[in-house]
Design a protein with these regions (language model features):
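Right-handed parallel beta-helix
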Residues: 189-248, 253
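Short, surface-exposed interaction patches in beta-rich subdomains
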Residues: 97, 101, 150, 170-172, ...
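Extracytosolic and intramembrane catalytic regions of membrane-associated proteins
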Residues: 122-124, 128-161, 165-166
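Alpha-helical transmembrane segments and their membrane-interface anchoring/capping motifs
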Residues: 1-140, 171-178, 182, 186-188, ...
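Envelope-exposed proteins and targeting segments
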Residues: 101, 108-112, 117, 127-133, ...
Length: 458
């Protein structure tokens, strides 16, 4: 009946996804009833149960597959994050349709709200100060009549007011609608997407995005941006306001931000930030850091943290990370529990505190620097220094203390289970020129989409 079209496949699998546990209960009830009815019959032998067991396993497997496809967005393999259109093609051929909507707006700085259950959203500024929507509809149905009916039901609904407009795409199973929108540049956009990518470029009024399954890409924005992620990558480039990202996801790439950059949540891919004029905040279950001014770049993955050219006071608290920091000016407070810590300072110098529970600590100071230092490591590890300082070994602990030059800044170094090393380095001054002295970026930095490659990358 499914293959002949007498029973709608979408309706059947939606029903089965919801009610398959009741079928199992019903099957169990029938078997129990049969057992009691045959209990008084001595000639009834033991029936083989292999077929029943395999039937139960098949029902559970089909129920799990149907329910997963129903919960993550009906038939998400067909209209999911990677646009795999083949899995559910047996439901019927793909039908496509385009809808154009032009809407006048009374406000010069409207509030635009967009709700899309499945599909991508792309927003750019309009040239006439009005709103223009192009909706590309995609459905899998066995007949043209069904597809035409769905196209009409899927037409975006636009509700206008004196403050702006609300654009809503109806939620229909096994469908997808991609929106390409042009809105007034000064509009404040609020976008909610359940399954699909969100791209915004050139807005000056600000944007807030909530995306459950999909990537978010923002570029050339002249106001604040806030994204709530669940699954997917986030990128923002050339942002004049704040950039705030929270939730869970994969890669995060943020570059050329004039305001604050804040990442709060569990992101399991690579984290890349570069040239942030405001304060950088990052918080997860494994890493907590704050950098008042990131002149260079920051790279973070599951095992490494690299920071290049940053102005303090820098604060880093990490677990199970190898930390590599270069050209760090001002105060720095660093804690690590399972990994090596390597820091090279730059002028203007500040107080430096490093505590590492398990791992080596290496600090490089300019050879002409003035500072006082206290440091300690366990007795079975090594302490090495290029400076004329006092070292002792008492009660299973090695210590390092003394002053260089006229004292100056204070250093406090602890390596609970690891080597401690204080090195001489060349003098360096942190330039606040965001283009950098040599054009280099931190290792592993992934340039934002659309950025021109360097000579080395070419």
């Amino acid at each position: 009946m499914l293959t002949t079209g007498h029973l709608d496949a979408v309706d059947f699998w939606s029903w089965y996804a919801r009610w398959w546990p009741m079928l199992l209960i019903g099957l169990g009830g029938l078997l129990l009833l049969e057992h009691f009815m045959d209990a008084g019959s001595p000639w009834v032998g033991r029936r083989p149960m292999g077929g029943i067991v395999w039937l139960v396993i098949l029902m559970i497997a089909l129920g799990a597959v149907a329910r997963e496809g129903h919960l993550v967005g009906p038939f998400a393999w067909n209209f999911g994050d990677h646009n795999n259109d083949d899995f559910w093609s047996w439901m019927g051929p793909e039908h496509d349709n385009d809808v154009q909507i032009d809407q006048a707006l009374s406000s010069a700085k409207p509030s635009i709200t967009v709700n899309v259950p499945r599909g991508d959203v792309t927003i750019t500024p309009s040239t006439d100060g009005q709103m223009h929507i192009r909706a590309h509809q995609m459905v899998h149905r066995s007949s043209d009549n069904e597809a035409r009916q769905l196209f009409e039901e899927l037409k975006p609904k636009v509700e206008t007011s004196s403050n702006g407009a609300v654009v809503t795409v109806p939620d229909k199973e096994a469908t997808r609608v991609d929106l390409t929108m042009e809105v007034p540049a000064a509009a404040y956009a609020t976008i909610t997407a359940q399954h699909g990518d969100v791209t915004a470029d050139g807005l000056t009024g600000g944007i807030q995005v909530t995306d459950d399954h999909g990537d978010v890409k923002l570029e050339d924005m002249a106001a604040d941006a806030h994204a709530r992620m669940n699954h997917g990558d986030f990128s923002a480039h050339n942002m004049q306001g704040k950039v705030l990202v929270d939730g869970t996801g994969d890669d995060v790439t943020i570059s050329e931000v004039k305001g604050e950059a804040r990442v709060d949540g569990e992101f399991f891919g690579d984290i890349h930030l570069e040239q942030v004029s405001g304060t950088v905040h990052y918080h997860s279950s494994m890493t907590d850091l704050e950098i008042p001014h990131l002149v260079g770049s920051l790279t973070l993955d599951k095992s490494d943290l690299s920071i290049s050219r940053a102005a303090g006071p820098v604060r880093v608290i990490a677990k199970s990370k190898d930390i590599d920091m270069s050209q760090i000016a001002g105060d720095a407070h660093i804690e690590d529990s399972n990994g090596d810590v390597t820091v090279a300072t730059a002028s203007p110098l500040g107080n430096v505190e490093i505590a590492d529970h398990t791992g080596d600590v290496v600090l490089t100071m300019p050879e002409d620097a003035s500072f006082s230092v206290t440091g300690n490591a366990s007795g079975d590890e090594d302490i090495r220094t290029d400076f004329p300082l006092h070292m002792t070994n008492n009660d299973g602990r090695q210590t390092l203390d003394g002053a260089v030059g006229h004292g100056g800044v204070r250093l406090h170094l602890e390596a609970e289970h690891g080597n401690l090393e204080l090195r001489k380095g060349s003098s360096a001054t942190l330039s606040m020129n965001e283009s950098g002295d040599n054009g280099e970026t931190a290792k592993h930095f992934k340039a934002p989409a659309g950025a021109k490659p360097t000579v080395e990358q070419q």
